[in-house]
């Protein structure tokens, strides 16, 4: 298990070039009824009683965690499957998938020649009852086992979105395609204030219009990932690890 040591949302498949990554280690605690567990962190694996249950924390991106995990933190045999997640928040439709660190980490595995799965929990309310999380996890394990045993030879990675609903334990998995949606600016200009910190300079604060993304799903049709989740099903999208080209556009380009 290799994970970032801080929040790394919206970072895609980036690596922080020029940065030397530093590892620390934790031992995960027992599964309880809550979400928060703050274990002690160790700088060296030997002081944490390092074994199969120890987790490596890296001050890098999700994709970097995958790469380090594949080549420097593996056990006695090569890794045969990368599982990235679960992420608390949906990674469906083009708007979210392209920016997703969770999907980016799975993509890194696929680009290393390893089968990969990205797992995300899609919720409408952040107050998720712990039993729903447990049921979603159980359902996800069942689905991942199925995909592993029935892997499509053309697929390099799957991205899964599980709706965090009361009936998640029986939610049906459905193969989907990505909804190709767009939106406007993801920033708001900070106006009307001048402080010594900004010295009157123009500033822009992160503030995507998530409602606009939701509208693209509501207005869409067909078996896309966004609609399937809204219908209470689990979206399973098989992917190749590339930016898809347009095969019908070919030939020499003549410039006047």
Q: Which residues does each PLM region occupy?
A:
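Charged helix-capping and loop-helix junction motifs
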Residues: 97-104
């Amino acid at each position: 298990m290799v994970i970032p040591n801080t929040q790394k949302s919206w970072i895609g498949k980036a690596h922080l070039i020029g940065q030397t990554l530093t590892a620390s280690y934790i031992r995960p605690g027992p599964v309880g009824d809550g979400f928060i567990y703050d274990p002690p962190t160790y700088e060296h694996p030997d002081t944490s009683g390092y074994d199969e249950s120890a987790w490596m924390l890296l001050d890098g991106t999700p994709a970097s965690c995958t790469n380090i995990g594949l080549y420097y933190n593996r056990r006695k045999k090569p890794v045969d499957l990368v599982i990235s997640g679960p992420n608390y928040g949906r990674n469906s439709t083009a708007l979210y998938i392209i920016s997703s660190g969770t999907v980016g980490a799975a993509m890194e595995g696929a680009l290393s020649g390893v089968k990969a799965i990205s797992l995300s929990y899609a919720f409408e309310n952040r107050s998720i009852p712990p039993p729903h999380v447990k049921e979603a996890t159980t359902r996800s394990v069942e689905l991942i086992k199925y995909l592993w045993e029935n892997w499509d030879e053309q697929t390099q990675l799957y991205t899964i979105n599980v709706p965090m609903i009361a009936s998640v334990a029986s939610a049906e998995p459905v193969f989907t395609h990505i909804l190709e949606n767009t939106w406007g600016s993801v920033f708001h200009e900070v106006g009307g204030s001048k402080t010594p910190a900004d010295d009157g300079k123009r500033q822009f604060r992160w503030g995507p219009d998530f409602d606009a993304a939701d509208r693209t799903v509501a207005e869409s049709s067909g078996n896309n990932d966004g609609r399937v989740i809204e219908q209470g099903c689990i979206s399973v999208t098989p992917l190749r690890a590339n930016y898809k080209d347009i095969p019908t556009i070919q030939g020499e380009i003549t410039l006047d």
